[in-house]
């Protein structure tokens, strides 16, 4: 939604609008339910009969904000992973792919609703889109996190494909010249240090326990966490091997606990707590995966996440100026290469 244009072809939302948006709409997207025996039992009963939430308010808000804006309208190049439950394969809505496959130029509202349809939490999203020949194509989408919970590699693969095709936007970079990549990867926090589960307990679980246990969703947590961690580990290994680790910034907090790590507890108190955690995260030292033990550890140089983001912003600004100097007539109206 940050890349959607307003009527003046400026961003519809700024980063500063994210917090107020969640504070206003979060409690309505994820309403608190209680029932006989308390919230946990009420949620369990609801989950057995369908998605935990009907998604109606989320759909309403997204459609109201994004209207008729389509993928080709975005102010930056984007790639948005989803998963098609009918064809059982990932679907990537990419600014570059769309130019070749016109049926991928869907409404941003449909793409956003589809990629946020987390299994057990929100319903799958089905819609059709017309290609340039008038043919209808159907999509049956669920949350892209099931295939790319950390979509960093997805974005890098899109860039690599364009380099192979000799797209002038990336000249003269070579396909695997990762030292020329500038990567910012922002996580949503984990409760790794809380150690909610253990082998002795899990050994006794049946299907229902794996799906929901003490207010958590173990099976979902395991798949999403491992998927994100493997991407981070891979990128850390590659960038360190190429001596370009300063070009990869992973911002993540793995010290969450209790309701802080919940997917859907959107009470005012919890959202304020998460906001404070985010602010404090800016002041923390840049951390990186230790390739020996797999732990996310702060670096010794003392650079904070805030300083690292400022450094990246300066590099991007300089790169933009250089491109404009080299080709002032062709770059003026090009989209920034941000994924």
Regions found by a protein language model. Give the residues of each.
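Conserved catalytic cores and adjacent C-terminal regulatory segments
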Residues: 1-339
